[in-house]
């Protein structure tokens, strides 16, 4: 499964470079890059996981399986993030980053169920003014299985650091997570 996902991510990124290098070369917003990566990822997921019928969504914020209608985000991260970064910023990190930043950039899942949250992806541009720790901490939490409160439990997480502002962008760094830990690192 992991090798299959690695290939899917690699092919989707290749399509992004082939079709939308303008976004990277001109340092467009991370959301624009994430959107087009998700479009190509969806194509690859549908081809590679046809029987499973996964959905690919950007900044998905609903969990309709909850009786209280709470949004599908990492509420459990609030205290952890604030504790982890309390010495790094003058204000509380969630105020600094904005509450919306605890929504994943891209997820691969089945809508209407938490039984099969396959993949959560965080994308960051190489020239971001924020360090990687915040995104890494989110991916560790999204992939932990012991949390029952928010039932996130993604099987895998990917942190994709994309190089921008170059005529031919070099390969991105890809960090893989599972069970709340970094398990691998690739360069495509």
Model features per residue range: what roles?
Residues 21-26, 93-94, 123-127:
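Surface-exposed cleft-lining segments at the edges of enzyme active sites
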Residues 120, 131-162:
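Short, charged, amphipathic alpha-helix that recurs within catalytic cores of restriction-modification
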Residues 51-114:
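Active-site metal-binding core of divalent-cation-utilizing nuclease and nuclease-like domains
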Residues 12-16, 115-121:
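Glycine-rich, often proline-containing surface loops adjacent to acidic residues and nearby aromatics
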Residues 126-130, 165:
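Short acidic, S/G/P-rich loop/turn micro-motifs used as interaction or catalytic elements
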Residues 1-43:
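Charged, often low-complexity linker/regulatory segments
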Residues 105-108, 117-126, 139:
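Conserved catalytic cores of phosphodiester-cleaving nucleases, focusing on short active-site segments
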């Amino acid at each position: 499964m992991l090798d299959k996902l690695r290939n899917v991510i690699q092919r989707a990124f290749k399509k992004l470079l082939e079709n939308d290098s303008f976004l990277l070369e001109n340092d467009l917003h991370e959301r624009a890059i994430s959107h087009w990566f998700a479009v190509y990822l969806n194509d690859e997921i549908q081809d590679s996981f046809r029987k499973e019928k996964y959905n690919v969504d950007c900044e998905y914020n609903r969990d309709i399986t909850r009786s209280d209608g709470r949004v599908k985000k990492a509420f459990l991260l609030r205290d952890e993030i604030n504790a982890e970064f309390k010495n790094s910023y003058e204000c509380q990190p969630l105020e600094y980053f904005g509450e919306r930043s605890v929504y994943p950039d891209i997820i691969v899942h089945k809508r209407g169920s938490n039984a099969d949250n396959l993949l959560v992806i965080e994308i960051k541009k190489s020239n971001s003014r924020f360090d990687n720790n915040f995104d890494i901490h989110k991916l560790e939490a999204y992939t932990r299985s012991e949390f029952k409160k928010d039932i996130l439990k993604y099987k895998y997480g990917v942190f994709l650091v994309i190089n921008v502002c170059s005529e031919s962008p070099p390969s991105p760094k890809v960090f893989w997570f599972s069970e709340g830990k970094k398990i691998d690192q690739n360069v495509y």
